[in-house]
């Protein structure tokens, strides 16, 4: 019983500190999007990884909780555009199926069409076993070729890293 109490205490301590950790890497905009995806008012976020894994920095992947129940995961990444970078959010369910992909910050004058819901819906319901190929299962956008290829590569790299992590000891949440 004491071990369970200690575990509960440590989890609550981690949850209470997560606001500080989370705000360093994710914006209020991302937080609002995550709350909308899960139809909740105030999600809690816990850093999922204790250390970096190949392809994923530990401070970019979060487990999403509502009232102590794990709802899914959020990944905040950065990808290259023509002359700068853009930030994006990928929200997963507990089985790592994509529930939402969103471009959070796009810093270029051209190519911002990759932020459209219509284009990003191509990633919905995909899992770490799926792969993406520009002009095969990912549509091109005139004037946004570099950003489209960059987002496609970023999603591929994320899925490959998640698949590797799942296959090397991380338990599946199903």
Question: Where are each of the predicted segments found?
Answer:
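Flexible, solvent-exposed loop/hinge segments and secondary-structure transition points
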Residues: 20-138, 145-149, 153-174
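Positively charged n-region of N-terminal signal peptides that target proteins for export
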Residues: 1-7
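Bacterial N-terminal signal peptides
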Residues: 7-18
């Amino acid at each position: 019983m004491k071990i369970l109490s200690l575990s509960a205490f440590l989890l609550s301590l981690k949850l209470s500190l997560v606001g500080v950790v989370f705000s360093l890497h994710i914006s209020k905009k991302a937080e609002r999007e995550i709350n909308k995806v899960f139809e909740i008012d105030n999600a809690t976020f816990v850093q999922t990884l204790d250390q970096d894994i190949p392809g994923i920095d530990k401070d970019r992947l979060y487990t999403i909780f509502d009232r102590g129940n794990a709802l899914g995961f959020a990944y905040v990444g950065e990808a290259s555009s023509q002359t700068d970078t853009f930030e994006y959010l990928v929200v997963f369910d507990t089985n790592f199926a994509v529930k939402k992909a969103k471009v959070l910050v796009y810093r270029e004058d051209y190519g911002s069409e990759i932020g459209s819901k219509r284009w990003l819906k191509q990633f919905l319901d995909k899992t770490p076993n799926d792969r993406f190929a520009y002009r095969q299962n990912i549509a091109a956008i005139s004037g946004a070729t570099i950003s489209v290829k960059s987002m496609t590569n970023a999603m591929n790299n994320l899925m490959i890293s998640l698949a590797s992590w799942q296959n090397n000891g991380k338990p599946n949440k199903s």
